[in-house]
């Protein structure tokens, strides 16, 4: 698999100057906002926001909450060389891909035993992570326990001669 490097540059820019993406579908409960502010206060920025150039300025793809939490700060931004359609795909998949990761309970237990925080919201996040109860932190949406596989009943998988998979609605 050939992977393209789409990062044009790393810029430092005032967070309030970044344009929020009007298609951003993620919402951020108060518990998440508080925990992020706590981590930023204790550690600072250790990861870049993601944006693309538009005629109106840099539009966010990833990092909306960090930008909102620190509007007066100069923040690191990875500027990507992607078009609007590619940005939409990233916006739709970036967080869900991360949330698909599993848990190694032994390693998580060891890690949590070794970390401390002076921030109440961060400590509550760590407790919830330890209890595997992030949903108990507050107003997170209830996604349910199981995937309803019935939603795929009308979808047909087609494999073309080159081996690519395509999905279409059954006729």
Give the positions of each predicted feature:
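Aromatic/glycine/proline-enriched transmembrane-helix motif characteristic
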Residues: 1-171
